[in-house]
Design a protein with these regions (language model features):
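Short, solvent-exposed loop/turn segments at secondary-structure junctions
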Residues: 60-61, 90-91, 150-152, 211-213, ...
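Elongated, non-catalytic scaffold/linker segments and compositionally distinctive motifs
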Residues: 65-84, 106-114, 119, 247-251, ...
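Active-site catalytic motif of lipid deacylating hydrolases and related acyltransferases
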Residues: 27-32, 39-114
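Ligand-binding face of N-terminal immunoglobulin V-set domains in extracellular IgSF glycoproteins
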Residues: 360-366, 371-374
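Serine-dependent carboxylesterase/thioesterase catalytic core
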Residues: 25, 53-57, 83, 95-195, ...
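Flexible, membrane-associating and regulatory peripheral segments of lipid-active enzymes
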Residues: 2-9, 13-62, 79, 292, ...
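C-terminal catalytic-base region of ester-bond hydrolases, centering on the histidine
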Residues: 198-333, 377, 382, 403
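Short aromatic-enriched loop/helix-cap "lid" or pocket-rim segments at secondary-structure transitions
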Residues: 68, 155-160, 216-221
């Protein structure tokens, strides 16, 4: 009888111990319900001097990212930290996620009874700052650690909303408010407003990665495209992960996935958890906004017929090529025809990564390619979207960049020492929202088109001849710009 009473008493106590945060969910819940959060496993010995850790996931993700093939939650427990894990909207912008996160941070703060340290991966770091600055969550948070967060957006989002890249992204269902908000022009506008309102700049600690794997790896697509923008982790450039006023602690040999791995990262940022944020070492950085053009890629995309043929030019002196053909089919591998008639069919196929999850990348690297007109041919058997990305390792890249920067709005054709002729064509699309675009009149100088408030995807096609007059070349520059309600243009104008 006494044993039964003890069991009943224990059950009642257990019920009430969970009741205070039962609304938050539990580890056994199906992950991915926006607004649900749960406490992590309790450490053997609680230490009230250690702030609770709140883990926030990124775009197209959920709280499961900290558990699935990841021991971050375990590392927190082993090191004596209480923790909480939250699910935000995987496909919503920083405004909506920031509001939701602010509400939940107050709940979590009330449960633990002391200030929190928020650890945000990727867009989760941006959502966290939105919660603090725009939705008054600062009182609940001691500091914020961001892991590979695109504080200035990512050119991969620009690519997904460009004329060439949007077809495939839309068919794959990747175009969302979340991806839309990460375009560099929109994030430039976000930074312009947010940085002025940030009252506690020393709360932020950033970490970044500079690895994106080897040829054919899961982050190879993003890394190859981003390399002309600088060091990157396969999804975000190092410069974008840094804030001018934050404690930008370290850039390490992590990619965008491994930077959230517990074994890799917890020992790295552990000493920052108890450090005074205002007194932490701060790395001096240059402005993340680079006005340089990335002139080492050629981009073409759209919707193909059953058979699709695209052509591009390789100039003399090119050291190497990286060719990627993205489509929905693992089997529909393209063939590449060199100017001398050689046919390449041994392309490697792998699953594509952000922002083209669900697609397949068929790719090949070519050393010392034959100069001239190259052709890539694909037979999908049906109408299907595709995206062609060609990266050039060429001495001409810097020359094109320098000459393109000189061209200004009034010049569409000019020459230099290594270039006989350089021409450009500008295509501009206006976005009313994350799903709909509206083409604007194409002109060589389209700055005067940027009048209406909203986002503008600008694609600049460069074509020309080298000094010999016999070798053609082509490049593509893509940027998203944002015009605010006062007519201010945010982002790098690529012409």
């Amino acid at each position: 009888m006494i044993l039964k009473k003890l069991i009943c008493l224990a059950a009642v106590m257990l019920f009430f111990s969970f009741a205070s945060y039962a609304y938050a969910g539990s580890i056994g819940d199906e992950p991915g319900t926006p607004g649900k959060w749960f406490k992590g496993e309790e450490p053997v010995q609680k230490d009230e001097s250690k702030p609770p850790l709140v883990f926030v996931h990124g775009i197209n993700s959920s709280s499961a990212t900290w558990f699935d093939r990841n021991d971050m939650a375990k590392q927190a427990v082993l090191n004596g930290y209480e923790s909480a894990f939250i699910d935000l909207y995987p496909d919503q912008d920083t405004k909506k996620n920031g509001k939701l996160l602010a509400e939940k941070l107050k709940e979590i703060y009330d449960v633990f009874g002391r200030k929190l340290i928020v650890i945000g991966h990727s867009k989760g770091g941006v959502d966290t700052q939105s919660a603090l600055v725009y939705h008054n969550a600062h009182p609940y948070v001691e500091k914020v650690i961001t892991l590979g967060s695109p504080h200035y957006g990512t050119p991969l989002a620009d690519l997904a909303y460009s004329k060439g890249g949007s077809w495939l992204a839309e068919i794959l269902g990747q175009k969302s408010d979340a991806l839309y908000s990460l375009q560099t022009g929109l994030m430039a506008a976000f930074r312009s407003e947010t940085d002025k309102l940030e009252k506690f700049p020393h709360k932020y600690i950033t970490y970044s990665g500079s690895e994106w794997g080897t040829f054919g790896g899961v982050l190879y697509l993003g890394g190859m495209y981003l390399k002309s923008f600088g060091a990157n982790d396969g999804a975000v450039t190092v410069s974008s992960t840094r804030l001018s006023y934050a404690n930008n602690i370290l850039t390490g040999k992590w990619d965008h996935n491994s930077i959230k791995n517990g074994t890799s990262m917890f020992p790295v940022f552990q000493h920052q958890l108890l450090a005074n944020a205002a007194s932490a070492e701060k790395e001096n950085i240059e402005s993340p906004n680079s006005t340089e053009l990335n002139t080492d890629v050629y981009v073409k995309g759209g919707e193909s017929e059953k058979e699709k043929t695209e052509a591009f030019y390789v100039e003399e002196g090119t050291n190497g090529l990286s060719i990627q053909w993205l489509n929905e089919s693992q089997e529909a591998r393209p063939e590449i025809i060199a100017p001398n008639g050689d046919v390449l069919t041994n392309l490697k196929t792998s699953e594509a990564s952000f922002p083209y999850e669900g697609a397949f990348s068929h790719h090949v690297q070519i050393n010392k390619p034959v100069p001239g007109k190259w052709t890539i041919r694909s037979n999908s058997g049906k109408k299907a979207p595709y995206l062609l990305l060609v990266s050039f390792d060429s001495p001409l890249n810097d020359e094109i960049k320098a000459e393109a920067a000189k061209s200004g709005d009034d010049a569409s054709t000019h020459s230099s020492g290594l270039i006989k002729r350089l021409s450009k064509k500008v295509e501009t699309f206006y976005f009313k929202d994350a799903q709909k675009d509206h083409p604007l009149k194409t002109t060589a100088s389209s700055a005067d088109q940027l009048k209406k408030e909203g986002a503008y995807s600008v694609t600049v096609h460069y074509t020309g001849l080298t000094a010999s007059g016999t070798s053609a070349f082509n490049r593509t520059v893509i940027r998203t710009l944002y015009v605010d309600q006062d007519g201010n243009i945010h982002g790098d104008i690529p012409y």
